[in-house]
Amino acid sequence: MSEDHTKADNLSEKDPHSPERSDSSSHEDAHAREEEESSDDDGALDGKPASLIAIVMIALSLAVFLSALDTTIVTVALPAISAHFNSTAAYTWVGSAYLLANAASTPIWGKLADIFGRKPMLLLANALFMIGSLVCALSINVGMLITARAIQGAAGGGLLTLVDTIIGDLFSLRTRGTYLGMIGGVWAIACALGPIVGGAFTSSVTWRWCFYINLPIDGLAFGIIFFFLKLKTPKTPILEGFAAIDWAGSFFIIGGTLMFLFGLQYGGITFPWDSATVICLLVFGVVCIVLFGLVEWKFARFPIIPLRLFQYRNNCGALLVAFFHSFVFISAFYYLPLYFQAVKGATPILAGVYILPAVLSTGVSAAATGAFIGNTGNYLIPMYFGMSMMILGYGLLINFDAGSGWAKLIIYQLIAGIGNGPNFQAPLVALQTKIKQSDIATGTATFNFVRNIATAISVVAGQVLYQNQLKKMTSTLQQLGPAASLIAAGDAGANTQAINALPTPQRDLARSAIADALSPMWIMYTAFAAAGLFCILLVSKTELTTTHEVTEVGLEAQKKAEAERKAERQAKDLEKAQKS
């Protein structure tokens, strides 16, 4: 299935250091690199002391841990924050500002890392994250807090993308799977620990510690990265570097993403889905994204998301698998806590504890997948295994009802979690097998951008389906009297205390209704997992090399790569002309 693609890749990925190049060209390139790069070595960690690898990976893991933790740490603290500032806007926007900025900024970080270097951009993202965290902790009004959360989110988008990119620079294709799996496990565990940590701080100290806690941890990560991470750092002139940024593409992708996600955020909550506001946001968001594609195709010299990433079936398959995997797995972290609070009567903190079977099994299976890929060089087996287990696990969640016992609740979560883990990073390894080393940053940023969009759409799709199911139960819910409005609104997550305070017969009826409304949602997620399984058929098998390939970064490297691509296109055009 992959033979043609492999041949095409071999043609398009000719070694830029092959003997075919002239001596003068090699001399010019060496001179350019000498002028451009600092004294850092090539950054390869393959074969380096295990202690050095451990130190660097701890720092990278801490950065990703904080980025993921802040995605969910405020969920339990939001009522206290809203009460402190006496603002209903805080309940919606303190959480959303982080997620929106995170998603919109992700594509930009990859190209910034190509132009200015990985290490400077990672340090910048860490610094911005610390600044945002400090301002959040010291906020004196809700506007200040929301703005700081947006800064945090933009930095958080850079942390995950840059860490994945740097691992691609530090290790060979064969080795990097181990460390990408580790990062995937850290991300999953941090996301799930957020509500527990946030709830503990809010109840025992103050909600401000949800942000203070980032400072010492991120400071430690910053210091380790600064002193121990050795990567080639280009001496790109600031003004020349900024002039090379695809500003038109940045405008359209950020604007389009924000409008689209704002439309999803407002739809069915702030405004009806058929309102002019929601329709305009969604339509113009899509239009901007289409215009972004046009800019990348025709006008951008150094595209943020180069369309050449999509020229191979393998790459499209890997991105589709990432989309469907993200669409499905986020549902467990988002809707299982709702089930435990609204149906099982758990507090927010206990709900976080109750989903630990899914969390821990996700983290362990992600790390185990990385080790498997590193030892065997096979990423397709984990992809098939993971999606198959997701189909089984999320299919079993359909059976969760008001009377489900703990054996069922734990075992079914474990199965779903085992399915979650493998496809956090295996599709990324698959993607990186078919792109040049010079495209690692933009490819990784595109991968994470697809994930962010998938999770945003997934949460809204689940909520819409859940609300529609409750509307079908109107006659049943009328037996609850005034409390029916709490359930029928589809906002049971915000009204769990009121539901749990109902008299026993009404409470049992409400819990059964919510559990029944969640079942069709799990059916949808199971179907999407099945779609993801079929998409793996598009992914080709490629031998993972153990040879480390040095990544050239900086503006001169971008210009050289552009010239090589132009020469390749001209050669192909000439070959076609000769054949015709």
Swiss-Prot record:
<feature type="compositionally biased region" description="Basic and acidic residues">
    <location>
        <begin position="1"/>
        <end position="34"/>
    </location>
</feature>
<keyword id="KW-0472">Membrane</keyword>
<feature type="glycosylation site" description="N-linked (GlcNAc...) asparagine">
    <location>
        <position position="86"/>
    </location>
</feature>
<dbReference type="GO" id="GO:0005886">
    <property type="term" value="C:plasma membrane"/>
</dbReference>
<feature type="transmembrane region" description="Helical">
    <location>
        <begin position="127"/>
        <end position="147"/>
    </location>
</feature>
<keyword id="KW-0926">Vacuole</keyword>
<feature type="glycosylation site" description="N-linked (GlcNAc...) asparagine">
    <location>
        <position position="10"/>
    </location>
</feature>
<dbReference type="Pfam" id="PF07690">
    <property type="entry name" value="MFS_1"/>
</dbReference>
<feature type="region of interest" description="Disordered">
    <location>
        <begin position="1"/>
        <end position="45"/>
    </location>
</feature>
<protein>
    <recommendedName>
        <fullName>Efflux pump dotC</fullName>
    </recommendedName>
</protein>
<feature type="transmembrane region" description="Helical">
    <location>
        <begin position="409"/>
        <end position="429"/>
    </location>
</feature>
<feature type="compositionally biased region" description="Acidic residues">
    <location>
        <begin position="35"/>
        <end position="44"/>
    </location>
</feature>
<keyword id="KW-0813">Transport</keyword>
<dbReference type="GO" id="GO:0005774">
    <property type="term" value="C:vacuolar membrane"/>
</dbReference>
<comment type="function">
    <text>Efflux pump; part of the gene cluster that mediates the biosynthesis of dothistromin (DOTH), a polyketide toxin very similar in structure to the aflatoxin precursor, versicolorin B. One function of dotC may be to transport early-stage dothistromin biosynthetic intermediates from the cytoplasm into vacuoles, thereby affecting the rate of dothistromin production.</text>
</comment>
<feature type="transmembrane region" description="Helical">
    <location>
        <begin position="380"/>
        <end position="400"/>
    </location>
</feature>
<feature type="transmembrane region" description="Helical">
    <location>
        <begin position="519"/>
        <end position="539"/>
    </location>
</feature>
<feature type="region of interest" description="Disordered">
    <location>
        <begin position="559"/>
        <end position="580"/>
    </location>
</feature>
<keyword id="KW-0812">Transmembrane</keyword>
<feature type="transmembrane region" description="Helical">
    <location>
        <begin position="348"/>
        <end position="368"/>
    </location>
</feature>
<feature type="transmembrane region" description="Helical">
    <location>
        <begin position="153"/>
        <end position="173"/>
    </location>
</feature>
<keyword id="KW-1133">Transmembrane helix</keyword>
<keyword id="KW-1003">Cell membrane</keyword>
<dbReference type="GO" id="GO:0022857">
    <property type="term" value="F:transmembrane transporter activity"/>
</dbReference>
<feature type="transmembrane region" description="Helical">
    <location>
        <begin position="318"/>
        <end position="338"/>
    </location>
</feature>
<dbReference type="InterPro" id="IPR036259">
    <property type="entry name" value="MFS_trans_sf"/>
</dbReference>
<feature type="transmembrane region" description="Helical">
    <location>
        <begin position="181"/>
        <end position="201"/>
    </location>
</feature>
<feature type="transmembrane region" description="Helical">
    <location>
        <begin position="242"/>
        <end position="262"/>
    </location>
</feature>
<feature type="transmembrane region" description="Helical">
    <location>
        <begin position="49"/>
        <end position="69"/>
    </location>
</feature>
<dbReference type="InterPro" id="IPR011701">
    <property type="entry name" value="MFS"/>
</dbReference>
<dbReference type="InterPro" id="IPR020846">
    <property type="entry name" value="MFS_dom"/>
</dbReference>
<feature type="transmembrane region" description="Helical">
    <location>
        <begin position="89"/>
        <end position="109"/>
    </location>
</feature>
<feature type="transmembrane region" description="Helical">
    <location>
        <begin position="444"/>
        <end position="466"/>
    </location>
</feature>
<comment type="similarity">
    <text>Belongs to the major facilitator superfamily. TCR/Tet family.</text>
</comment>
<feature type="transmembrane region" description="Helical">
    <location>
        <begin position="275"/>
        <end position="295"/>
    </location>
</feature>
<keyword id="KW-0325">Glycoprotein</keyword>
<feature type="transmembrane region" description="Helical">
    <location>
        <begin position="209"/>
        <end position="229"/>
    </location>
</feature>
